[in-house]
Amino acid sequence: MRIYETMFIIKPDIAEEEREKIAQGVVDYLKEKLGAHVDNVDRWGIRKTAYPLKKYNEADYTIVYFRGEGLDITVLESYFRVRPEFLRWQTFRRIDLEKKEKKQSRKEEGSENSEKVEE
């Protein structure tokens, strides 16, 4: 199963409750439209940007970790593109986390096999 991370930046002049709804809307979209399993949502809140984004020096940052098989990420990119409240977004595959998870599962399988041999 592939693991993805998406970070999106929301305009800071939107009310806090509305920004929460927007972030939850992304999570719901991932679950309902893409069929993804959301592992973690990390809300950073309003932070200073490295450079002005559409005349904003601050923005609300959110990172979402999700997983799925055969996900069409371009659909998620379109979701961000048509909504003006998003200043920036980036989605990428986390191959490092996939490898770590595979290594962990192999280690667990190895310990199960050694227990069976001892019995």
From Swiss-Prot:
Please identify the protein, giving its name as recorded: Small ribosomal subunit protein bS6
Biological process terms in GO annotation: translation
The species is Thermosipho melanesiensis (strain DSM 12029 / CIP 104789 / BI429)
Task performed by this protein: Binds together with bS18 to 16S ribosomal RNA.
UniProt region (Disordered), positions on chain: 99-119
* Disulfide bond entries: none
Whether Cytoplasm counts among this entry's keywords is no
Assigned GO CC terms = cytoplasm; ribonucleoprotein complex; ribosome
User: Which keywords does the record carry?
Assistant: Ribonucleoprotein, Ribosomal protein, RNA-binding, rRNA-binding
Q: Name one Pfam family in it.
A: Ribosomal_S6
